[in-house]
């Protein structure tokens, strides 16, 4: 039996309010197999939130022969899941590894009377469907039955294990370097090669930081900078394209491009309901260069803020604020589109250079050159990006973390600083982290004025109440004073992103003002498919006055 070109595995972490939508998607995927014998190998892991429905392994690879297997009945799993029940914990990284092992090594295949095991292929795609919030670990592929969520480190460990070749497995087993729950010295080959496509049918994963994290383990990544509707990807359209005769010999970038086009076109029909989406396909082989160019930009920006008394310091303080305000944003305005940010920054620096002249022009020109270099690398990295609706119309395919305040940074700092797990990144942390800390903790914060005992009539009387220690005063004078305040990330604070908080004034909302998106799952949302529900729309919203969608990318 000859290898098919593609084995596509879809991991549906639906033990939450996405269960019904994922059940519909499951039927869409099953329908793709009816196209014909040339359809790809199709597998789905489905974990719903009904206690009466067990977690399922589904094989839709052959027309008319859909196979459903209860996960808990699969014997001798590679990595047994602790306290395994009928409803499996989809947020356990071992569940992912076991599912992929079943797809490529264990599923029974009958062909012309002969029995074999596993459906291998020339190319592999792994698509995660569920809740996410970018690099944050808040609600990542949340499993409500177990009360657990995944972490970015979990996903990294999973992809590393899946893609290891025989030599790497043998060496790692000999050196006993397994980490976390994958410490068992298993040398069983899974994919044995980098993923051809890594997809995230979930919110806010289209970040430079996320893509760079996985750039050594996958060739192409498909993700969205903003929110994804609860209904998720239109799998019937996306996967059905692969089964068409004219598309069977497409290379991987062309397949990824096809996914983006089909998703944007199908979602365009829902703009009348206020639905806005974006999606991009990336060539991760170029992400090292994109990250390097972005690193150079961050270093130049840091140079601008060495002397608070300098003219360039004051000018760039205003420029950054202005550009940040106008830029395309995502994730409660905590992320900015990288292309839009650099384009606006380039333009503003050019305007200022014409006005101020002098020695400051040189550093402004350095910023402009760095912005243009980021733009060039971005165009090389983004195979195709697209949007539909008005909310994401300035998207260019890749976003970066840029919160508005030190409080917003503090709530995410631990996760953000732990992102760089790959060998290349641990040698040199990107300077953007240093810029964020410089800008948010010093540049954008007003310094406290010292109290004055001699207060003239009509002025403000400043007085320190209570006892102040020297270290508190030093912190306050440097603009970092957080004493006796409720700072994001501290226990008891009410900052968006903490469990149980009220985000954007809407209790139980998924994302500010949008119902039904796949933002790090919170209870209380309205699920598509239920009577009277609203599917991923904004009631009464106005759509940027544009007909149709705009596909932005490379031919």
Model regions: which residues?
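Active-site groove signature of glycoside hydrolases
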Residues: 119-135
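Long, intrinsically disordered low-complexity tandem-repeat segments
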Residues: 485-554
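Structural recognition of the beta-strand scaffold that forms the well-ordered cores
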Residues: 7-11, 41-46, 124-128, 196-200, ...
């Amino acid at each position: 039996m000859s290898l098919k070109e593609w084995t596509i595995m879809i991991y549906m972490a639906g033990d939450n309010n996405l269960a019904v939508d994922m059940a519909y998607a499951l039927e869409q995927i099953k329908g793709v197999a009816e196209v014909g014998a040339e359809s790809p190998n199709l597998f789905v892991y489905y974990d719903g939130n009904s206690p009466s429905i067990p977690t399922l392994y589904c094989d839709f690879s052959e027309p008319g022969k859909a196979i459903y297997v209860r996960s808990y009945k699969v014997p001798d799993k590679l990595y047994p899941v602790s306290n395994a029940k009928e409803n499996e914990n989809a947020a356990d990284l071992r569940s992912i590894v076991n599912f992929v092992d079943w797809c490529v090594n264990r599923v029974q295949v009958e062909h012309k009377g002969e029995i074999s095991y596993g459906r291998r292929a020339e190319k592999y795609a792994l698509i995660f469907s569920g809740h996410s919030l970018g690099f944050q670990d808040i609600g990542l592929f949340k499993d409500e039955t177990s009360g657990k969520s995944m972490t970015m480190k979990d996903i990294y460990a999973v992809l590393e294990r899946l893609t290891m070749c025989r030599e790497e497995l043998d060496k790692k087993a000999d050196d006993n370097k397994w980490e976390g729950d994958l410490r068992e010295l298993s040398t069983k080959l899974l994919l044995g090669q980098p993923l051809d496509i890594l997809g995230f049918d979930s919110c806010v994963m289209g970040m430079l930081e996320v893509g760079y994290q996985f750039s050594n383990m996958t060739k192409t990544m498909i993700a969205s900078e903003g929110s994804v509707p609860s209904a998720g990807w239109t799998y019937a359209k996306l996967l059905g394209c692969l089964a068409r005769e004219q598309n069977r010999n497409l290379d991987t970038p062309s397949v990824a491009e096809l996914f983006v086009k089909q998703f944007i076109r199908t979602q365009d029909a829902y703009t009348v309901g206020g639905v806005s989406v974006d999606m991009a396909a990336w060539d991760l082989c170029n992400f090292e260069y994109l990250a390097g160019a972005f690193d150079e930009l961050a270093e130049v920006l840091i140079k601008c803020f060495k002397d608070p008394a300098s003219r360039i310091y004051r000018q760039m303080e205003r420029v950054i604020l202005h550009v940040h305000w106008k830029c395309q944003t995502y994730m409660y305005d905590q992320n900015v589109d990288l292309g839009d940010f650099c384009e606006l920054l380039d333009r503003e620096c050019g305007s200022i250079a014409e006005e101020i002249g002098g020695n400051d022009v040189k550093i402004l020109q350095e910023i402009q050159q760095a912005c243009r270099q980021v733009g060039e690398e971005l165009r090389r990295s983004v195979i195709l990006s697209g949007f539909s609706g008005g909310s994401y119309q300035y998207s260019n395919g890749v976003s970066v973390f840029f919160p508005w305040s030190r409080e917003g940074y503090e709530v995410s700092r631990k996760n953000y600083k732990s992102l760089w797990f790959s060998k290349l990144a641990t040698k040199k942390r990107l300077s953007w982290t240093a810029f964020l800390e410089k800008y948010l903790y010093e540049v954008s914060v007003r310094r406290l004025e010292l109290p004055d005992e001699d207060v003239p009539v009509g002025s403000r009387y400043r007085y320190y109440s209570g006892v102040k220690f020297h270290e508190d005063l030093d912190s306050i004078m440097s603009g970092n004073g957080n004493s006796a305040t409720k700072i994001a990330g501290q226990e008891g604070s009410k900052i968006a992103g903490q469990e149980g908080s009220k985000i954007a004034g809407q209790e139980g909302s998924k994302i500010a003002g949008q119902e039904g998106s796949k933002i790090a799952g919170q209870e209380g949302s309205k699920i598509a498919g239920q009577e009277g529900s609203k599917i991923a729309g904004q009631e009464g919203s106005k759509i940027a006055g544009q007909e149709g969608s705009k596909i932005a990318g490379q031919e």
